[in-house]
């Protein structure tokens, strides 16, 4: 097994909402502007943060999760990045030690040093206690130092620095500023494509970081390069239509890469804007925000008829979360506004004010076992008997249904297709290739 070396840093925090994404994006934009090739990863299954980080770095962002992605695939992704980049940045998820697996587990497994980001607003000496806890809760954690976020002044930054334990590295204090705050909504950050001033925000964050913090490259980390695992090109010649617009944008880059590696040609289309489907053998409707675009989705009757005709012809259709909601008879948003949708999956859903499911999921389908995750604010009433139900590896009761009507497969689960390439191919292969 060969090795690849590259400077790397995992940006983590004691909790969500501390500014991990802002700091990671600022670092990525700063180094990219200096001509470095930056590759960014996101711990866990999140879709929204990677959209911001991809814009900041100028390169696709991949998820890293020791369970959903798997250690071997995570190692391959990191080694590939190390072979082509000048800097690897990994944004953590939730708090540093939260979840199973956690961001700390990933840092320890691959020897990536951790930069702790702590929201220093309205805080003084307690900052030092939080920093000490992050560094010492797990003795074998490679910990690089801390950065204060949302700092009120230079004097405030000095106070935070001076309360750190002896020997702990102080990266600096990023000031509080509306110029680079990233807005959010019910599922997380607002999508990158919806922020007209995103590049200005990222540049402002990079400028502020350069003026207030250490931004030198971290020490190189050695990554083992695994032997390549050849894939059978079982989707050779298959054309897959992939919905991608403001309604349906929750797509793992690794899923798209895999489908192409299996031989498929991807044709992207917009259920919001397009009047017809591209000429395709199969359809993939990912998650997103259909509830924010009910009027336009309901009004695009030409697209609705095209998707209904695709299903009636017995062609494969895979729908995840928001894509599944699009297939229902009716979707109602949290304010009571309703939209009549495709009617391919008998049932209705309603958006709630609170989160209704958040869990990793593994499900056994006739095509094979797939892993993924679920994260939604809606409740579903569906008359179809589930084909299967997911299982949460952490013992939670969440067991998302997978529905099957002919070649239509739909679920709240966002599938991580590289967890079983053969199953992914079977779900999307036309009948002539499935025998």
Curated annotation (Swiss-Prot):
Where the record annotates domain GATase cobBQ-type, the positions are: 239-422
Query: Where is the site described as Increases nucleophilicity of active site Cys found in this chain?
Result: 414
User: Which NCBIfam families did the record assign?
Assistant: cobB, PRK01077.1
Task performed by this protein: Catalyzes the ATP-dependent amidation of the two carboxylate groups at positions a and c of hydrogenobyrinate, using either L-glutamine or ammonia as the nitrogen source.
Q: Which organism is it from?
A: Pseudomonas aeruginosa (strain ATCC 15692 / DSM 22644 / CIP 104116 / JCM 14847 / LMG 12228 / 1C / PRS 101 / PAO1)
Q: Say which enzyme class the record assigns.
A: ligase
Q: Name one GO biological process term.
A: cobalamin biosynthetic process
Specify the domain of life of the species encoding this protein. Bacteria
Keyword field contains Protease: no
Instruction: Identify the InterPro entries for this entry.
Output: CbiA/CobB_synth, Class_I_gatase-like, CobQ/CobB/MinD/ParA_Nub-bd_dom, GATase_3, P-loop_NTPase
- Mention one GO molecular function: ATP binding
Q: What cofactors does the UniProt entry give for this protein?
A: Mg(2+)
Q: Name one Pfam family in it.
A: GATase_3
Q: Which PANTHER family does the protein's record reference?
A: COBYRINATE A,C-DIAMIDE SYNTHASE
- Protein's UniProt name: Hydrogenobyrinate a,c-diamide synthase
What keyword terms does UniProt attach to this protein?
A: ATP-binding, Cobalamin biosynthesis, Glutamine amidotransferase, Ligase, Magnesium, Nucleotide-binding
